[in-house]
Amino acid sequence: MQFKDILNKYLKETNSTSKELSTTSGISESVISRYRSGKRTPNINSPHIITLATSLSILSKKNIQINENIILKELTTSLNNNFNYENLSNNLNNL
């Protein structure tokens, strides 16, 4: 699964909107929109990853309880899986 798929899955499971996630996380709605559409993904070391996991966990408490660590693990794993090895190979070949 890609980052956007996991983010959308948790928003759906928590029955939350992008606006609620933005308000809870402090991340702008436009950035969340880009994350949700896949137009942008955070760097694996970005504080947005932890912020999103924490915020989704907080939002889950209004409906179902989702563990922050589980969310964080899924989000970071998806970013590791998105690495473009073909692009790296092409860049190295151009050196």
Q: PLM features: residue spans?
A:
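A short, Lys/Arg-rich alpha-helix, primarily the initiator
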Residues: M1-E20, T24, I50-A53
